[in-house]
């Protein structure tokens, strides 16, 4: 149920409504293009903070019996930050940026502890089903609340609201309430798992030092699985491009003059259309292989990013949104499953922990590159082309991955 709960923040705040609101309302008095750059900068800082915290939080999650308490703490931080966004009005760009950044850290950090609970609530033969089921619930939950939020914004008078601005602020408050309420079942029904505390580590500092030593050991071990390591590097690069598109699409569209209703409706289209296409990508991978399918996904991303440079109308934005829906879920899901096939099963948790940390660190560079390119060129339209570099470089690294050799190494 926590996937259902936290997805509201991902869809309404990170992806759909807040970026548009920030550009058109909170940052309306800023110089042209500055709101989009500020949003990219805030995203970079939040992701960097999360990446720095990740190994330390992972240490506590592995060794101390406080997973649920820390999950609750960061969930509460995220909920409060989302609720505070409802206070943001025209010109409050600083308050908006601070709340958005803190909310991002709370959201990401809570997932560290949530993910660590999975092996404790599902048997080994159930983990894939439980994990994908949670992912589907997340799509559903985020889509349902976003649909309601879109209805408020498109027709505020129908719901007794003054205008779209008030409807947007109510949407942020609804995220806080939704996130909190649907988190309750986890805290009521999931027991705090036993930990390795006491096995040679006695203080918080020693626990963290022990975990970081284990992280360095895992990195050294991964070098033995050369093709899995190359896949990890490739994924970190192109996933950064995917994340940048996801996080900055609506603010970019708003800056180019696409109205708020069209932007949010397009994101809603991605949310629901992405579900069947993710399954179709799985079928495609069964026929031509995961690696080839990922290449197709990256080619589509290159095409839609170039298309974003030429985008002028709402119809263009809808077409690009549909292109995202065709590849977003499938590309990321196949990347994870391909990585899983190239690491020893007995050490999957260890290697996926490293996967998660690398992913968080990698996510910093896309928004940072976009902001730098925007400042250099003076145009977000030109800056969007910088994202193509991540897809091309990631695909180039992926081309060196020998899937069969990697799978053989994992089984030896």
Mark where each language-model region is.
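Helix-loop junctions at membrane interfaces in 12-TM secondary transporters
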Residues: 86-99, 309-321
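Intracellular juxtamembrane helix-capping segments at the cytosolic ends
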Residues: 109-122, 330-344
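Juxtamembrane intracellular "pre-TM" segments in multi-pass secondary transporters
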Residues: 191-232
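Helix-loop boundary and gating motifs at the non-cytosolic
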Residues: 1-47, 227-266
